[in-house]
């Protein structure tokens, strides 16, 4: 896959996608009513901000592919939901899982 400074191999892209999937999964654990108690010491807002900055860096490196726009939109919607007084974990979860599914579209040439 072409990027700003050259080319990433298919295995590099696959490895990165796997790591990004794992980072997105943590977003679920941090807010899941069944597991959130285990992560009280985690600064969720900071984790989220750092993750978004990392995705923004990828966005620039890959010359702004469409799936990353969608990923960022879904994640921002999840974050907004997480900050509401009437936080609905299922709504939040749906946004995160939608973003999770879009990760696999990064690098697909036929994505428009």
Regions found by a protein language model. Give the residues of each.
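Short intrinsically disordered terminal tails
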Residues: 1, 48, 109-112
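Generic preference for well-ordered secondary structure
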Residues: 4, 8, 55, 59-62, ...
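Amphipathic alpha-helical binding modules
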Residues: 72-112
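Short terminal alpha-helical segments
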Residues: 1-42, 96-105
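Amphipathic alpha-helical interaction modules
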Residues: 22-73
